[in-house]
Design a protein with these regions (language model features):
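Beta-propeller fold detector
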Residues: 34, 76-80, 119-123, 160-164, ...
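Short loop/turn segments that connect beta-strands within beta-propeller blades
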Residues: 69-73, 112-117, 152-157, 193-198, ...
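Beta-strand-rich domains and repeat architectures in extracellular enzymes and scaffolds
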Residues: 34-64, 527-532
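Blade-level signature of beta-propeller repeat domains, shared across WD40, Kelch, NHL, RCC1
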Residues: 506-540
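Sequence/structural signature of beta-propeller modules
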Residues: 1-29, 539-540
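Beta-rich, blade/repeat-based domains predominating
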Residues: 6, 38-52, 82-99, 108, ...
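A short helix->beta-strand "capping" segment at the edge of beta-propeller domains
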Residues: 18-40, 496-502
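Short loop/turn segments immediately following the C-termini of beta-strands
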Residues: 60, 104, 143-144, 185, ...
Length: 540
């Protein structure tokens, strides 16, 4: 069974990705503890060493770019959530210090001047991802099946196509020989092309799914492998490779600061590769969101975190049950509910409901073609109640088909099941909580209700807008606030831009401050603002 490891004291005011002005508070008779540490970043994607020597870090899901000072450890936000740049995936600098960012979900390339002014250079590059600047020339790749490799006109003219029909090219670099090197994820190879024209050539193949390449100061090609978790040094003339480090799946990009090599990971971890297989953690990883939560029959807490699925161990560490590139992974996970015997019902951002057995590396899709799925709950009959936010519906998914239980809802997000089998749903767009089949509303006047759980005839709702946990009795329907100033939702004054998704890896993404209850009535909360998981208990 999971247990809390960090009491809620001043330590909740952690200098992470979320600006904390007030520590969380709870009503009398309750205690709040933190189970996982806050995350410093919203994951870590593209890396680039800036002209000031800092390491710039793109964070797709956070719509944020941060800069890390290696000498002090200081982490500054350069482009914040809710700002002009949306879902940045890779970065490059020109000779004047302008920062170019690919916005993978919006198909854009934007330019941020040293004074902070930002403008869109192009908005017609689907799955814009890899980017590099070389001798006044800007190159961009589309990370999709049938993607193109482009040279962009810095004045906004039509791009020049270097290559077409590429199977998902990614983060690229011009080598000492003047050729443009780029990983091709769909081919599991690294290619190169003359930027002045020519046919792509394969440099190395049979890799661990390369997703980024850079050159070290000695002219060696270095590449991260997203599937195998290896960092390889490759001879660009022969294709021979050496393993510099074996880390974990989910590596994303790399950068050199002088002779020092740093790599990024989906988890937000930044690792320095020291040579001879040794590594050093520069920034620790953490949860990217988190999203849905579920407690199994053994009392273990499972966490859906988009590209990862975790179980929280008793010592507070996270054990990976599966991730985007592991066998049987259903896809970008959002909602989760325990089914028993190591099996879970999950919803994905690709519009699928699946039964997932992480320890067997198996999954089975039971419904597909749905629009922005969020919470899932299991009825006593075995049916799965699912919130379909995009269609404004709650669905019942059974082996014999899918039935619409309610329609015309305003952004349904969270679902839970009462002891007598009724479905409770939160409507984030209407600020209310409804029990399906009832004539009235269970709770209204909320700002943005998301996660919902039922325990001991109490309905617990996370209001991510008000940053509160509200409880309402199913009988009296009297509400009361249990916790406030919770690290959920967006910071005050920030309106996040929509994350449209990046097929085939994910559909539209969005926050989900979930809540679930354990067998001992402990409440677990997805603190999606600071990237932690909290536990709320009644005092004995």
């Amino acid at each position: 069974m999971v247990r809390a490891v960090i009491p809620v004291t001043r330590r909740l005011q952690h200098a992470g990705r979320y600006p904390v002005t007030r520590a969380p508070n709870v009503a009398e008779g309750w205690t709040l503890t933190r189970l996982t540490a806050p995350s410093r970043l919203f994951g870590a994607n593209g890396l680039r060493t800036g002209p000031d020597g800092r390491v710039y870090i793109a964070q797709v899901t956070g719509s944020q770019i941060s800069a890390l000072d290696l000498s002090t450890g200081r982490l500054d936000t350069v482009c914040p959530k809710g700002g002009a740049i949306i879902a940045p995936d890779d970065l490059a600098f020109d000779q004047d210090g302008n920062l170019y960012a690919t916005e993978v979900m919006d198909g854009r390339v934007s330019v941020r001047a040293p004074d902070g002014h930002t403008r869109v250079l192009r908005d017609d590059i689907p799955s814009a991802n890899g980017i590099t600047f070389h001798q006044g020339r800007l190159f961009v790749g589309e990370c999709r099946d049938g993607g193109r490799l482009l040279e962009l006109d810095l004045n906004g003219g039509a791009p020049r196509v270097l290559a077409r029909n590429l199977p998902s090219p990614n983060a690229m670099e011009v080598g000492p020989d003047g050729l443009l090197y780029f990983p091709v994820m769909g081919a599991n190879e690294i290619w190169r092309i003359d930027p002045d024209g020519g046919v792509p050539q394969c440099v190395a193949g049979d890799l661990g799914v390369p997703d980024a390449v850079k050159f070290d100061p000695h002219g060696h090609l270095v590449s991260t492998q997203v599937h195998s978790g290896e960092v390889l040094r490759i001879n660009p003339r022969t294709g021979d490779r050496t393993v510099l480090a074996a880390l974990h799946p989910g590596l994303d990009n790399l950068t050199f600061v002088g002779e020092r090599l740093f790599v990024s990971s989906f988890t937000g971890e930044i690792t320095e590769i020291l040579g001879t297989g040794e590594t050093r953690t520069t920034l620790p990883g953490g949860l990217t969101w988190p999203l849905g939560l579920a407690v199994d029959a053994d009392g273990d807490l499972y966490i859906a975190d988009g590209t990862y699925f975790y179980v929280l161990l008793a010592d507070g560490t996270l054990r990976v049950g599966g991730m985007l590139f592991s066998a049987g992974y259903p896809g970008f996970l959002r909602g989760v509910a325990a089914l028993g015997s190591g099996e879970f019902a999950v919803t994905t951002s690709n519009g699928e409901v699946a039964r997932y057995r992480p320890w067997a590396s198996e999954s089975e899709v039971v419904a597909t073609g749905l629009d922005q799925l969020y919470g899932v709950a299991v009825a006593g009959s075995g049916a799965l109640f699912v919130a379909e936010r995009g269609a404004g519906q709650v669905l019942s998914v059974r082996p014999d088909g899918v039935e619409v239980m309610a329609s015309g809802l305003s952004d349904p997000v969270g679902v839970a099941v009462t002891a007598d089998g009724r479905c409770v749903v939160t409507e984030a767009g209407a600020g209310r909580v409804r029990t399906l089949g009832d004539t009235g509303t269970l709770l209204d006047g909320l700002q943005c209700p998301q996660g919902v759980a039922i325990c001991d005839r109490q309905v617990y709702v996370i209001d991510s807008g008000a940053k509160q946990l509200v409880a309402v009795d199913l009988g009296s329907r009297t509400p009361h606030t249990i916790a406030w100033d919770l690290p959920v939702g967006a910071p005050a004054g920030v309106t996040p831009k929509p994350l449209r998704g990046m097929p085939p890896f994910s559909g539209p993404q969005g926050p989900f401050a979930a809540i679930t209850a354990g067998p001992d009535s402990t409440l677990y909360i997805s603190a999606d603002a600071d990237g932690s998981v909290l536990a709320l208990r009644r005092e004995s």
